Amino acid sequence: MAILDEMNKVFREKFGAADTHAYFSPGRVNLIGEHTDYNGGHVFPCAISLGTYALVAPRTDGVSRLYSMNLPEQGVVEFPMHGAVKTDVYGWANYPIGVVRMMEDAGHAAAHGFDILFYGNLPNGAGLSSSASIEVLMAVILNDELGLGIDMVELVKLAQKAENIFVGMNCGIMDQFAVGMGKKDCAILLDCNTLAYRYSKLDLKGCSIVITNTNKAHSLVTSAYNERRMQSEAALKALQKVKAIKSLGELTNAEFDENAAVIEDEVERRRARHAVYENRRTLEAVEALEKNDVKRFGALMNDSHVSLRDDYEVTGPELDTLAELAWQQEGVLGSRMTGGGFAGCTVSIVRDEAIPAFEKNVAEAYTAKIGYAPSFYVANIADGARRL
């Protein structure tokens, strides 16, 4: 594997010669069910073949050294395996360091450190979960190298905890779950309330999943993500006065409509409407896919984007332009923003023979309107994080 050959060379330069183990952790794309995970709803993500690679060698002391080939300007980051705390100096390394700390807090302290080289081929800031990819990768590395025997769902929870508590990003469980539990050629229907899940075979009948990157820089931590979460929680509190529910995901559309007036704030009401309707849309979409009705699945993806645009307001001109252009193209069954929003990517279901024209037409019109070009990736649906 050419990637690993290059990584071996850099590993020797940075850390010296050592016997290394190789690991890989995918990125993810969510097909439908956006901003529902922390609202106790369903999501339908899959792991993709782009992701994060690592080479790992054990050390004899209690220190770890990390180096990212993607961010060489940051140099080697050194940190203690015990009692690590977040610091701006660590930069990107706060994600893997957070996992070390969460595992230590959960009673899985490491007896020694590691030298770890990272390389990712996920486009930066594309909203394809590069942070979750690194977190789950680190959890899998520690579990494997230290022989801890922790099951993947627990590793996923520890990775999410690292992002919530250590990094300070209030994300739901979807990203880490998709990265850890991904399965080739399948998407995962996950109930974020209970973590009950099942795999659904992605047979798209002569169509492919095309990811289109706006190429607009974004950082979720500094965007309005946490604000949306607070608005949804405020709406839930209002609804709990009249309905015995723990999350918005428990409501049907009709139940929400009957009780929506108790949410006095109009913005909070729209946020909650998205969460409830999107959850139902997701269940309907999976049902359609399992009945081989790819057309209906695509139409529900379009509805999802409209709801994210109008009720949840997390799209923005770049994502809206991509989705609206996709809807106009021949051979496109559905298209929507995926991920947290504000920038990042759309996901489209496109007939295989229409992909070249789709890419050409969307690229030309998007560049003319936005001023820079988008990028396209045809997604290969892959297995979750693992040792290679």
Mark where each language-model region is.
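C-terminal nucleotide
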Residues: 1-28, 53-89, 186-334, 349-388
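Gly/Ser-rich oxyanion-binding loop with an adjacent helix/lid
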Residues: 1-23, 29-33, 42, 79-81, ...
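N-terminal cofactor/phosphate-binding cores enriched in small/glycine residues
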Residues: 33-35, 47-48
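Short Gly/aromatic-enriched secondary-structure transition segments
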Residues: 40-47, 228-229
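FabD-like malonyl-/acyl-CoA
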Residues: 132-133, 345-349
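Glycine-rich phosphate-binding loop
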Residues: 342
